[in-house]
From Swiss-Prot:
GO terms for cellular component: cytosol. Required for insertion of 4Fe-4S clusters for at least IspG. Pfam families: Fe-S_biosyn. Binds 1 iron-sulfur cluster per subunit. SUPFAM superfamilies: HesB-like domain (SSF89360). It comes from Shewanella sp. (strain W3-18-1). This is Iron-sulfur cluster insertion protein ErpA. Belongs to the HesB/IscA family. The keyword Iron applies. Its cofactor is iron-sulfur cluster. It comes from the Bacteria.
Length: 116
């Protein structure tokens, strides 16, 4: 996919996140799994991000494919994530998937919850 096409996507999926998902799927030996990102009420700032693996893509879900793996977002969550980017980091504090969300007006210290 070209950079211009990537820029038109409502949510981005970084190379680091895609590579980690690919590695996890190889460990699980289940290539049908997809990384599902969702937003739920809760956390110290009002909303929180969730990540899970799912074999299904439901009607209305938005998908992004990179490096042969898929990121899936339900339509309700997507409205809070438009313009965002799902990334993966590994460091002294641990390893995790996270969302860079331009719609978040405040976030908590750990970055797991936000408000709009």
């Amino acid at each position: 996919m070209t950079e211009q096409a990537d820029a038109a996507m409502p949510i981005q999926f970084t190379d680091a996140a895609a590579a980690k998902v690919k590695g996890l799927l190889e460990e699980e030996q289940n290539p049908a799994l997809k990384l599902r990102v969702y937003v739920t009420g809760g956390g110290c700032s009002g909303f929180q991000y969730g990540f899970t693996f799912d074999e299904k893509v439901n009607e209305g879900d938005f998908t992004v494919e990179k490096q042969g793996v898929q990121l899936v977002v339900d339509p309700m969550s997507l409205q809070y994530l438009v313009g965002g980017e799902v990334d993966y980091t590994s460091g002294l504090e641990g390893s995790r998937f996270f969302v860079k969300n331009p719609n978040a007006t405040t976030t908590c210290g750990c970055g797991a919850s936000f408000s709009v």
